[in-house]
Each structure stands twice: as C-alpha cells, then as structure tokens.
From Swiss-Prot:
The lineage of its organism: Bacteria, Bacillati, Cyanobacteriota, Cyanophyceae, Nostocales. GTP binds at N146, K147, S148, D149, G197, P198, S199, G200, V201, G202, K203, S204, S205. This is Small ribosomal subunit biogenesis GTPase RsgA 1. The keyword RNA-binding applies. It comes from Nostoc sp. (strain PCC 7120 / SAG 25.82 / UTEX 2576). It is found in: Cytoplasm.
C-alpha cells in the first residue's frame, strides 16, 4: 500500500501546457477532512481537505533529472499546495496502466471512435484505417456514428449489418437532435475515454453535448473537400457529469498504421475469427498468396488488409535502409498514403559549398604559394 504524508495530494493530469501541468485532484481528496501534521496517510485514509479542485503544477527537478515524463492522464502525487495561488508541485508519477504515444495519453481505458454517416459521407477505407489504428492500442473500441438523422432507417440498417460483419456494433447518434446521447454517456461513466475520428464528424459537438457549458470550438465541413476543419489543437481531459474523463484529440483524416507486418492481421476481428477456427500451413504466413492460408478469402476488408500490409512492409524496409548507410534507394511517401522508391542522392555530392569553406580553401592556397 502506498503511503503519503500530510501535504501530499493525489490527482490526475488533465492538461499539459509548456512546462506546466493542470492537475485535477481526486474527488475523495477534495471531500474528506484533514489529519494532524506529520501523520502518515494511506490511500484508504482521509486525506487533507482541498479548497480547490484544480492546481497548476510544475514538475520537481528530481523528476526532470531521472527523465520522468508527465503525460495527460498520469496519476500524480502533488505536494506543497499553494491554495491562494492555485499552485503545486508534482513529486511523483504513479505506474501507468496504459500509454498512448499519439495522442500522448496515459491510463486511458477505451477509445470512442466518432464518424458521421453523412456530411461528410462515411468512407469505408478511412473508417477501416481508423479501426485498425484503434485496435493497435489494445484499448476497447466504442464506435459511434453521428448525424444519423440525415439518413433513413433502412440506410442505418445496411450500415449496421456491414459493420457487424467487420466485427463492430455501431451506435447511431445525432448530436443535433440529441439521439442516443444518454446511451453514449453510460459507456463513458467512470472511465478515461479518448475521443478520436476524422475532422468534421462532430467530435467537439458531441463533447459539448456530454459536458454542458464546456464550449469547445466547433468547426464546419469544408464544402470543397467535404472534409472537416481542425478545431482541437491539443490533448486535454474533461470531467464528465456522471464521473469519468473525456480526452478530445486533434482530428486527422488518414492515421498512420505503424504496426509490424506480422502483427497487422491480429487487428482485424474478421481475421482473428478465422484464425480461431483454423491455422495457416506456414507459421510465417503473410496471408497473401501462400497455399492453405486460413485468412485469405471472401471477406470485405481483405483488400484493406493487403493495402495496409504493403504499407507496413514498405515502412519496415525503410527502417532497415535507414540503418544501412550503403543503401541506394529511399522510400518517399506520396499523396493518399502511397509510397514509392526513389534513387538516393550521394551524400554531400550535390550540396553547395559554403562561402566559409571557399574562403578557407583560398587561404590555404595562398599559404601554399608563399
């Protein structure tokens, strides 16, 4: 059992701004009474009474020296609170249960993947890419489809049947008409949830509906590109009325699927289901053209798997080439995630000589003539 002393508080980092950390103190910490000075305090014992729920903190120099990073979502120990100024110092970071690098969030429990069924229209390839990226985190995935009021019930059923074949049960919502917002709130209760999805699908509007008076900036869909404009610039956790924290993340339209070629197949529920009832002949099967492959077959996202596999192989090859300075090819990423190899220019051969080097060369020449 972890032991704290009086003057130490427990909380969660909800925002990072430069070298400052906004820490939300635990509810039980804020509600329970104080103890005598110098007395040890256990996690199951009353902690000091806190006049404030949020403190703006810095990181102790000791943590900087040992390279301890502080992330949004981290459980931290805060000491020496200045209640008048609303300040404190982070003395320790508790062990993380989970960690995401992009976006940088610790201790997340699940991903709420938000897409729209219309305006912008639902793109199966883009959705598939987001789903695979979400699967790579190891977190539970909750898929919700916004703007359901813009399509008929028949279209909703077609979309639902299609996604069920992918291995996902979508929840149709409408922020505009407050459809199924209460049901979404039940999924988020007492958990740290990361909201993800492309720009323009209504992520910020959904958060505004779930957390009244938060007033997140909401953008419109670009008429020319039929894509949303970015309105979220950084990662921040917001407290839900019924408990739990919600992380709004910057929207993007084509997430990187940066897993290894060998791992990729396990991020498709359809492929996992096939591998659960049969095995491939070869242990290193890539599920492309090998004989007696259990994965290859007539399932809709198999073509997506092949495209993502080609990207993963190209990325792995690029890493090998970066480690090999003698390589004569380099991988260039073009539009829409397409990649191709190009000849690598000889190092420094085509670099213009600096004026300083030219002057030094002339000085050496004069010295030789003398």
């Amino acid at each position: 059992m972890r032991v704290f002393t009086t003057g130490q508080l427990l909380g969660t980092v909800v925002a990072v701004q430069a070298n400052f950390y906004k820490v939300q103190l635990d509810q039980e910490v804020r509600e329970q009474g104080s103890r005598g000075a110098g007395e040890e305090v256990h996690l199951d014992s009353p902690l000091p009474l806190c006049p404030l729920s949020l403190l703006l903190c810095t990181r102790r120099t000791r943590l900087k020296k040992i390279g301890q990073q502080v992330m949004v979502g981290d459980r931290v120990v805060v000491e020496e609170p200045d209640w008048a100024g609303g300040r404190g110092a982070i003395a320790d970071v508790l062990s993380r249960q989970t960690q995401l690098d992009r976006p940088p969030i610790a201790n997340a429990d699940q991903i709420l993947l938000v897409f729209a069924v219309a305006d912008p229209p639902l793109e199966p390839y883009q959705l598939s890419r987001f789903l695979v990226k979400a699967e790579t985190t190891g977190l539970d995935v909750v898929l919700c489809l916004n703007k359901s009021d813009l399509v008929s019930p028949e279209i909703q059923q077609q979309i639902s049947d299609r996604l069920l074949a992918w291995g996902y049960q979508p929840l149709f919502i409408s922020v505009e008409n407050q459809i199924n917002i209460d049901q979404i709130a039940k999924y988020l209760s007492n958990k740290i949830t990361v909201v993800a999805g492309p720009s323009g699908v209504g992520k910020s509007s959904l958060i505004n509906a779930l957390i009244p008076n938060i007033n997140l900036r909401v953008g419109e869909v670009s008429g020319k590109l039929a894509r949303g404009r970015h309105t979220t610039r950084h990662v921040e956790l917001f407290e839900l009325p019924n408990g739990g924290l919600l992380a709004d993340t910057p929207g993007f339209n084509q997430p990187d699927v940066d897993c290894s070629p060998e791992e990729l197949v396990h991020y498709f529920p359809e492929a996992r289901e096939r591998l659960a009832i049969a095995s491939c002949r070869f242990n290193d099967c890539s599920h492309r053209d090998e004989p007696d492959c259990a994965v290859r077959g007539d399932w809709e996202r198999y073509e997506h798997y092949l495209e993502f596999l080609a990207d993963a192989i190209a990325r792995q090859t690029q890493l090998y080439q970066q480690a090999d300075p003698e390589s004569t090819l380099k991988l260039k990423t073009k539009g829409k995630g397409q990649s191709q190899y190009e000849p690598k220019l000889e190092s420094k051969k085509y670099r213009r000589t600096s004026r300083r080097t030219q002057v030094q060369g002339l000085q050496d020449l004069y010295q030789e003539e003398e």
